[in-house]
Amino acid sequence: KPNNIALSLKNKKTKTIGIIIPEIVHHFFATVISGIEQVANECGYNVIVCLSDESFDKEVINMEMLANGSTDGFIMSLSKETQQKKDFHHLQEVINQGMPVVLFDRISNDILCDKVIIDDQLAAYEATNFLISKGLKKIALLTTVDYVSVGKLRTDGYLNVLHDHGIEVDENLIIRIEDTEHCDEKINELLENQSIDAILAVNELFAVTAIKLAMAKGIKIPEDLSVVAFTDGIISKYSTPTITTISQNGIKMGRKAAEMLIKRLELEDEEDEHYKTEIIETNLIIRESTKS
């Protein structure tokens, strides 16, 4: 078996892919890594995973460290702070050096590179539409602050479907949650002050928190309140009641991102500037948290 270190010095190829993700709490990111790892291993690549912890500085440091000869290319999802700052110089520098980058989930249109996403707007539209089809009208949205790209797109999908059904948008029902620490009080406030019959949550954590707080108030799920969440993770499958979710197909997303990156790495000599954005299908998995 050839010695990898010797080979990489000879070819200037490390056969290693750097992954930078914003956090590891969400099951979604774990599934994406798993998909990347599968394809990387099938193609003889190793994977190094770094966390930006939603911090711009940490994202830059991780990138500089990995671009310093220890990886051939990157797969990443942007941190909240990077999206807020709209500062992508670190990505631009790496791309200018000729290192391929694939962005997934939280992307920016300001960066020219390959991307893998779901149609966040359409997925939120379909999930809200599903709730409306069950005769529910007062649908609250638990989302992120607008500078997080996926939160903004999911909010747009929710607004579009209400508009299409002629349901008036009530801003009091749109709860933008900055971070998980304030999640409880914001959701509690919503349940105390608004009469709602459904919730769309942009992640599982918001959904399970809403269910827990609602049940503590004697609100029955799904009789009094239906809940749908993004991400088909472990929480949704095992919470009581189980949660109706939009599956983001993280494994598929990871596999696709790795395939795109490796294709770029192996193309090498042929300058192919046509960047692609691949859209992964989502599907609604109906469980106990919504009216049948």
Indicate residue ranges for each PLM-predicted region.
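Short, solvent-exposed amphipathic alpha-helices that sit
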Residues: 28-42, 123-127, 149-168, 209, ...
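Flexible loop/turn connectors
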Residues: 184-292
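Short acidic capping loops at alpha-helix termini that bridge into adjacent secondary structure
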Residues: 138, 169-173, 221-227
